Amino acid sequence: MIQTHSEVKRVEELRRLLQQASYAYYVSDAPIMEDAVYDQLYRELQQLEIQHPELVTPDSPTQRIGERPATQFLSVRHNIPLYSLENAFNVEELQAWDQRWRRQVAPTEAEYVAELKIDGSAIALTYQNGILVRGATRGDGVTGEDITQNVRTIRSIPLRLNFDGIEKVEKVEVRGEAFLPLEVFKQINEERQKAGEQLFANPRNAAAGTLRQLDSRIVARRRLDFFAYTLHISGMDDASIANTQWEALELLQKMGFRVNPNHKLCQSLAEVADYYKYWDTERLNLPYMTDGVVLKLNSFKLQEQLGFTQRFPRWAVALKYPAEEAPTRVENIAVNVGRTGALTPLAQMRPVQLAGTTVSRATLHNSDRIAQLDIRIGDTVIVRKAGEIIPEVVRVIKELRPADTQPFIMPTHCPVCGQPVVRETGEAVTRCVNASCPAILKGSIEHWVSRDALDIKGVGEKLVYQLVDKGLVHSVADLYDLTTERLFALERMGEKSAQKLIEAIAQSKNQPWSRVLYGLGIRHVGSVNAQLLSEKYRAVAELSSAKQSDIEGIYGIGAEIAQSVYQWFRINANQSLIERLQAAGLKLANTEEIPVMNNGILKLNGKTFVVTGTLPTLKRDEVKALIQKAGGKVTDSVSKKTDYLVVGEDAGSKLEKAQALGIAQLTETQLLEILEE
């Protein structure tokens, strides 16, 4: 189809509007456009590009997420090496670094730029004539991997630089840190835990692993963020080039990058030391991980004079915070069996205080990790924990190893049911594949009754264990065959308790199809994925008969999830389970229409809510469901992006923060009035 002049102009205008909106939302944290308007403009641009593929450009907002997974990452050589930084661990070592560089040059006054050291993964970005053409991992500093397709999904990285005259610049290279905000990291691990997947040990590992995903759709879902900190420009008039690190940070912001707002220009090492001490405690309140302070000489002229060693720039140093580490003794290595059959080794240790909590257990993940550490019962180990990170064994102090220790070997049979275990090709996890294994059954029932699934009140771990051990339940479908008489066989189960439990189980039949789908515990399917699947396939019959390729085509569903769902419905026992649940009266189809206003827009579309305190009549989950049903979003913490705070009795710090930010507050009654208008 031949494009008209007006269509070309419209495409250019749409790109400009969408790029401005993305910058305002993801970089400036000051939205200028409603989500619904953004979506409408995005769809219009997408449609025009489909009709006129010759108009598609690499910097178009539609090109952030690739259609197909990559098959491999290609090695690329960095134009300018990404050096490591020399480390200092206290103020004395910082002073020693300062004395070393001063011996290299004539006596001079110097300014320092102090920046928080973000605990993520370094990446290098290359722009030609203002357009992003390459993103690469740090690698060994000389050679990295081309991850351009994944870098495009990071919304705080501009696809086109926002700076007058930048399109005439031959090449711009930007370095920075890709990282996972703590709230996002927590959500990802919760999803992985519910889906029976191995948890990420910390946000840094999660960020690095995400950047190396072959499927950019998975990268997009994980919502990486980015702070820029280094700028190299070629082909630009000298007068326009920054002469100091401070000016470079300002220029990066003008170009459209997020720069960490907590950097400081210091006139002395004493100022640097104060900055370091301040953030040693304040960093715990940040929404991302930081493990130190990076100090750079501000003057580029001075940096050029000092140059580099074989490994480090002489003009910069990383002043690290001491890690939360402590030695302790491994008293036992237990092996747990999860609801997906995964065998997870667990180090049981002598209790030790770390990050304000008592740590006595740490996951060892799998047999590969055990072999890597060469950890044994009786070993003295260094265990680490910082903030909300999962406790991990960092290393074994082999000099303190008792003479009679033996290498730990993962069991060849399930420690619960005794059946042989398997380790599939390409997987690090060993699994019990016995569908009747009590551990798998108990885990699947706990998952079924959990808050995000069928939300059956009064069914905790102890009751689940009793139901399985007494032979009353052999699958989740058996819950719907329970009677008060049969429940009397359980310990501490009176008539009133039994009746309440039967009522709670019956009430779960009203839960929507998306929750039932999540409750089935299909591997890799978390609550968000279940929602996506249930929106596409509005009944179980549609999903069970869907082709794997069609499932994979859903935005947000990758190849791994699609394969898992497709294979689950091919198993006869699972088909029988679906039939029993259907016969029991559970909702295996969407029956409600999506509520819309007269103009077709959801009432709360694009609005972000936070709920605090105890509401008069509604539970928090009920409020969340009402808001989401009307197109709104509910988050756990108050920020500049929050539109409304729904306030109940005994509201705490969230109310204070909302008042400080000038965020509107609603009572339960006011919220219901908005929904009923």
Swiss-Prot record:
Annotated GO CC locations: cytosol
Cofactor: Mg(2+); Mn(2+)
Active-site residues, record numbering mapped to chain: 117 (n6-amp-lysine intermediate)
Entry binding sites for Zn(2+): 414, 417, 432, 437
Residues annotated for NAD(+) binding in this entry: 35-39, 84-85, 115, 138, 177, 296, 320
Keyword Manganese carried by entry: yes
Protein keywords: DNA damage, DNA repair, DNA replication, Ligase, Magnesium, Manganese, Metal-binding, NAD, Zinc
Pfam families, per database record: BRCT (PF00533), DNA_ligase_aden (PF01653), DNA_ligase_OB (PF03120), DNA_ligase_ZBD (PF03119), HHH_2 (PF12826), HHH_5 (PF14520), Nlig-Ia (PF22745)
Any one GO biological process: DNA repair
Boundaries of every BRCT domain copy: 599-677
InterPro entries: BRCT_dom, BRCT_dom_sf, DisA/LigA_HHH, DNA_ligase, DNA_ligase_AS, DNA_ligase_CS, DNAligase_adenylation, DNAligase_N
EC number: 6.5.1.2
Family matches, as CDD domains: LIGANc (cd00114)
Reaction equations catalysed: NAD(+) + (deoxyribonucleotide)n-3'-hydroxyl + 5'-phospho-(deoxyribonucleotide)m = (deoxyribonucleotide)n+m + AMP + beta-nicotinamide D-nucleotide
Keyword DNA damage in record: yes
Superkingdom assignment: Bacteria
Role noted for this protein: DNA ligase that catalyzes the formation of phosphodiester linkages between 5'-phosphoryl and 3'-hydroxyl groups in double-stranded DNA using NAD as a coenzyme and as the energy source for the reaction. It is essential for DNA replication and repair of damaged DNA.
Similarity comment text for this entry: Belongs to the NAD-dependent DNA ligase family. LigA subfamily.
Protein's name according to its UniProt entry: DNA ligase
Biological source species: Nostoc sp. (strain PCC 7120 / SAG 25.82 / UTEX 2576)
Gene: ligA
